Amino acid sequence: MPENMNRHLTALEFDKILSRLAEFTACPDARELAMSLRPESNLDLVQAQMNRTRDAHMLLARFGGPSFGGLRNVNNAAARAGAGSTLSLRELLDVAEVLRTVRALAQWRSTNAGVETVLDPLFSALQPNKYLETKITSA
């Protein structure tokens, strides 16, 4: 980032704004993403992100917020399982919790499915797996 941009961000106390935003995140990965945000100059990208924010705010205002409390990064565990490795009990429980969170989020969205948003492709990408979730938690 150009030096003059850093001066402007410092003057605006941008780091404090990011810290306040990060306080509202549900998991360490989201916190890291929030802290890494930087101003964007591409108008199309800014407009797309503003539309996402608008629609997320509208859904929250109309239907309340879903729970994201069980989010954990299980990428390493998924990759190891995909390669045939055995997962630890902690990793299995983390996977089950992520599956529960995905299922709850998909259910939350289905209760307000009559409202179209630019977030719909993200919600459509969610793939709940109640069978696997139950197999892990009942073992």
Describe each model-derived feature in a short phrase.
Residues M1-A139:
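Conserved amphipathic alpha-helical "coupling/scaffold" segments
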